[in-house]
Every structure is written in structure tokens, then in C-alpha cells.
């Protein structure tokens, strides 16, 4: 019974991962704001097509005053990943002097860039077929103290 539950959980986890066009690891960063630091995230293309991904920061709700947007430098901001490929993205977090032990948070957003829009609409016998694609966007938290 336990084996069946483990297999089901493993199967569901893999289905969710494969449904996304790309995956990001790690899914959370905890940074030390007393000093500067460089961190790495890895992007994996789960599709048979090349992907273009844009990376930027966003302020989460409740952290309008205590965010790290001005302290984070991302490079590269736009990347291309071959089918089944893996790329590394780095970001530098500049330390905050006179930190009053507040918790700071910023979202690092990975957004798939729009591909060339190719509309494929076929009309046959008053039926319409249309291709639809989704744009994947993943946000991970960067926490600092």
C-alpha cells in the first residue's frame, strides 16, 4: 500500500513538471544581507522546441517597503535554451548596511518570451481548428535578513 502511494505521488509530481515548458531549480533562495553574494539558478527546457526566457524581479504583496529589487542584478536577463537543454542564470545581491534585522523579499520571475505568433486556422465544412499555446511564468522567492 505504501509503495502504491509513493508511486502515485511520484507520478503526479512528474506530470506537473512535464506540463510546464521549463523548470527552475532551486525554488527558493535565502540570502545573507550583511555581505554581497552571487547566486545561481538553473533552467531546464522540457519541450522539443527552443525557448526564449526573460528574467526580472517583482515586488510581492506586503513587501513594498522591504524588497530587494534595487539590490539585485541579474545576468543574463534574456536567454535561449535548446530543446532538452539546461542553462544557468546568475544574480548578485548587494548587501544592505544598517539592516535592522528586517526580512526582505523579492520575487525572481522567469517568463517565457512570446514566440513568433503563427496563427493556424483551418476552415473545413464550417468547422474551425485553432492551435493554442500557453506562456509559462514561474516566480521564486528571494528572502534576505
What residues fall within each predicted segment?
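Terminal connector regions
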Residues: 96-145
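Beta-sheet-dominated interaction scaffolds and their linkers
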Residues: 19-46, 76-78
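Short, solvent-exposed loop/turn segments enriched in Ser/Thr/Gly
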Residues: 34-40, 87-88, 101-107
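Sec-dependent N-terminal signal peptides
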Residues: 4-14
